[in-house]
């Protein structure tokens, strides 16, 4: 073999080795990033894994042994959930709001908060959406702002934990900023040209921001399509929302 040919082969081997090493590092980096994300929140990072994590909590820690989740006649899922770092420890808690008749009454439904080790942190009665992450912190825990029995209430953490009955917690002034949110939505590019019948929609994701409001609206062209806008009053940002659960 001549020297030039030997050099080309050696160069090719080096390039191949470099590429292989780069791919390994890239995959390792992705895996590390995913693990870091899970470590940061303490919960599974993928939606599917997180759904399974919550389903296990419901099956083992909310429902009694042998019970199964019933079908809701209205088509709603038996529960919904959201996550947030309530106590600023770098790990997310999970709020699960039950939606079937076993856990719901005329004023609202039962909600539960669990940590990432599946330990129950709090239980709430007479709770419904919107359920927002409050800005204020008491004893290291964020307030939870939730609807109950015709009004929004501020659930504040105390030496005894969060209060059980949402409806007896202090009233939270939700309407003042909601009026400002209506103006921002109506003046947005998404609504003012072809929108009509703007109304509040309360299917916000659990632990949405305290200053966030959701609206639905129709189109003036007679289309059956219903669209949604989320308004953050503090940032003045209006965002179209594609799907609502």
Where are these regions (language model features)?
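C-terminal motif of bacterial Sec signal peptides marking the signal peptidase cleavage site
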Residues: 27-29
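Repeat-based blade/solenoid architectures
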Residues: 66-79, 124-134
């Amino acid at each position: 073999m001549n020297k030039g040919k030997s050099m080309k082969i050696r160069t090719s081997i080096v390039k191949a080795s470099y590429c292989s090493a780069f791919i390994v590092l890239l995959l390792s980096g992705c895996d590390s990033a995913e693990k870091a994300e899970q470590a940061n929140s303490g919960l599974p990072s993928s939606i599917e894994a997180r759904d399974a994590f919550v389903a296990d909590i419901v099956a083992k820690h909310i429902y009694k042994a042998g019970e199964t989740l019933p079908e809701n006649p209205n088509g709603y899922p038996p529960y919904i959930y959201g996550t947030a770092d309530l106590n600023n420890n770098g790990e997310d808690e999970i709020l699960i709001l039950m939606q079937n008749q076993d856990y719901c009454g005329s004023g609202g439904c039962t909600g539960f908060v669990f940590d990432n080790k599946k330990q129950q942190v709090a239980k709430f009665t007479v709770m419904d959406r919107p359920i927002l992450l409050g800005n204020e912190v008491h004893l290291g825990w964020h307030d939870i702002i939730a609807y109950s029995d015709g009004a929004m209430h501020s659930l504040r953490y105390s030496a005894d934990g969060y209060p059980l009955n949402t409806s007896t917690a202090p009233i939270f002034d939700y309407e003042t900023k909601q009026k400002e949110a209506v103006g921002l939505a109506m003046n947005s590019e998404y609504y003012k040209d072809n929108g009509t019948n703007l109304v509040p929609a309360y299917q916000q994701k659990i632990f949405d921001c305290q200053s966030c409001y959701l609206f639905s609206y129709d189109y003036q062209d007679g289309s059956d399509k219903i669209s949604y806008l989320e308004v953050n009053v503090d940032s003045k940002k209006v965002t179209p929302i594609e799907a609502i659960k």
